[in-house]
């Protein structure tokens, strides 16, 4: 998920994303995504994308650690320009490792289905 966040320079104050936590100026409403995201990064400089985007993609395509990724873009950073290296835009193929099923488990499931009177299969979910 890509969402807007507070201003990195903190000049516009208050903004919608801020919550009433006067002890910590870094807390925003987007922090609510931290507990449910496998990867969370607040983009407060344009060059942060050079590391954050590949990390987010790696997390989302790793079968062991996969999960949602959240990139929270500070509003003023969204309007900044940055001279990204050309190779950053080279198309990439993200290959997802697919572990093979355990042959014993496949045999057990096949036996259970064959022995069932009215088998029902709910598939999906990884």
Language-model regions, residue ranges each:
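N-terminal alpha/beta PP-like core and its mobile active-site loop of ThDP/TPP-dependent enzymes
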Residues: 1-126
């Amino acid at each position: 998920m890509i969402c807007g966040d507070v201003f990195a320079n903190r000049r516009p104050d208050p903004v919608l994303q801020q919550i009433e936590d006067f002890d910590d100026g870094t807390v925003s409403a987007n922090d609510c995504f931290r507990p449910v995201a496998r990867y969370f990064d607040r983009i407060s400089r344009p060059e942060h994308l050079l590391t954050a985007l590949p990390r987010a993609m790696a997390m989302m395509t790793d079968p062991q650690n996969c999960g949602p990724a959240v990139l929270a873009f500070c509003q003023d950073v969204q309007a900044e320009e940055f001279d990204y290296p050309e190779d950053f835009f080279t198309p990439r193929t993200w290959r997802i490792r697919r572990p093979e099923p355990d042959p014993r488990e496949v045999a057990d499931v096949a036996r259970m289905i064959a022995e069932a009177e009215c088998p029902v299969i709910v598939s999906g979910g990884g």
